[in-house]
A protein has these predicted regions:
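A short SAM/SAH-binding and catalytic strip from SAM-dependent methyltransferases
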Residues: 161-174
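Conserved class I S-adenosyl-L-methionine
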Residues: 63-73, 91
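A short acidic, Gly/Pro-enriched loop at the edge of an enzyme's catalytic core
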Residues: 148-163
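S-adenosyl-L-methionine
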Residues: 107-152
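Conserved beta-strand signature within the Rossmann-like core of class I S-adenosyl-L-methionine
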Residues: 190-199
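Conserved SAM-binding loop of SAM-dependent methyltransferases across substrates and taxa
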Residues: 74-87
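A short glycine-rich, Lys/Arg-flanked "PGG" loop and its adjoining helix->strand segment in the class I
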Residues: 177-189
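Conserved Class I S-adenosyl-L-methionine-dependent methyltransferase catalytic core
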Residues: 1-59
Length: 239
């Protein structure tokens, strides 16, 4: 058993909580990250390889058996890590149903025809491009896609020995200290956390616009030790 039991939120009736619920940011809809679908499963092979290699380099000789990718998007990094390691479980968590369903279908060996609307088309002819999504090979058993809020990941504490957060910390819209505390809860003894991507915090609260050094200090305050950081240039959504 790795899934935590679902319990009603404390502090009020369901009707009250629904009335007071926080709305999603206006830019967060089902197609907000559709470019990631095409990057992951069509034209972004080199970019995806660099991301997987960066995470693998951070792991060194470690051989995680239970991997959690929070904010997995369309799932290519989770797929690549699962294929590269001998993990018995890799859980790819994202709350976007389009990304989860496409990732599941393609990772299982399916092909999906889908029209891409590029973020910055170079000509009228490239404003809508027919693509075919597919994985290099079907995934081996153990890769699971879970549609859930990363701040409420439905797993028992201590389930994983590796948590990966790709391009997540500075876009999740929550204080970094809270995100890191939740990550730490999900890690078992001697577990590892690897963040891949930017740390360009630019939220409305100036106190949360952390530098890399401040992020490391925040992580240490939330129980992480032996922190190491490296920086490099990598392409991002470079179609």
């Amino acid at each position: 058993r790795i899934l935590a039991p679902l319990e009603p939120a404390a502090g009020g009736s369901l009707e009250t909580l629904l009335a007071l619920r926080t709305r999603l940011p206006p830019g967060q809809d089902i197609v907000s990250y559709s470019a990631n679908v095409f990057r992951d499963w069509c034209w972004g092979e080199a970019e995806c390889r660099l991301a997987a290699e960066a995470v693998a380099a951070a792991l060194g000789a470690a051989r995680p058996q239970r991997i959690l990718v929070l904010g997995a998007g369309a799932g290519r990094l989770a797929y690549d890590l699962h294929q590269r390691t001998d993990a018995v479980l890799t859980a790819a968590v994202d709350y976007n149903p389009l990304l989860c369903y496409v990732g599941r279908a393609v990772a299982d060996g399916g092909t999906i025809p889908l029209v891409e609307f590029p973020l910055a088309p170079r000509s009228p002819a490239s404003a809508a491009v027919e693509r075919t999504l597919s994985a290099p090979v079907p995934t081996r058993p153990g890769l699971e896609f879970v549609m859930a809020d990363v701040m409420r990941a439905p797993f028992q504490p201590g389930t994983f020995d590796l948590v990966v957060t790709p391009w997540l910390l500075d876009v999740v819209g929550q204080p970094a200290a809270d995100v890191l505390a939740r990550i730490n809860i999900l890690l078992g003894a001697d577990g590892r956390w690897v963040h891949h991507g930017s740390v360009a915090f630019d939220g409305p609260d100036p106190a949360e616009r952390l530098t890399l050094q401040e992020l490391e200090e925040t992580a240490a305050a939330r129980g992480f030790t032996d922190l190491q950081a490296s920086e490099d240039w990598m392409p991002y959504l470079a179609s």
